[in-house]
Amino acid sequence: NGFVTNLKAIEWYILTKNGGMRPEITGEITLMADTENVNIFIKTFDGFDVYVNGKMLYFPSSKAKEMLAIMVEKRGSSVSLSQMTYLLYENIEERTAKNNLRVVYYRLRMNLMEHGIERILIKKRGSYAVDTEQFICDFYEFIKGNPDYITLFSGSYMPEYAWADDMLPYLRNLYRKYNGGLI
């Protein structure tokens, strides 16, 4: 899957090998990005982060990052607009919260698009999800029993989000099952 964008009358800058920038053609440019060759790793243990080709992705806002974290935790199942609103904006009037949520989702999608990985998002009317086939996640691999990921769990799962605490008993039980020990 690739994408093609036509940019008209925009001066385009290209990073040079020595870290400088040089202007490219002004006029119509077709930008093609092959997103098949992008490696995406999502880390949930000891904090939530997303890596694209080994580099940490920075998010436009903490709410955009948390929104993605919620979708990742649901492992491909959809999160309704109401659920997402409650988790991100618990103490805000519903209409305002839903408007905020739309803006946050737009920013998240644009940020992921800048890195060629917006394909991980699935948006349907009134619900949000991630396509779990598009990335590797320590949480998913741990649940599958992948030995390379079992040792990564140190008892901490997205500690920056209070709602993630509900998953810890399940993860600790799995860890005990895999290792025959306590954590």
Labelled PLM ranges:
Residues 5-183:
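Intrinsically disordered, low-complexity protein-interaction/activation regions
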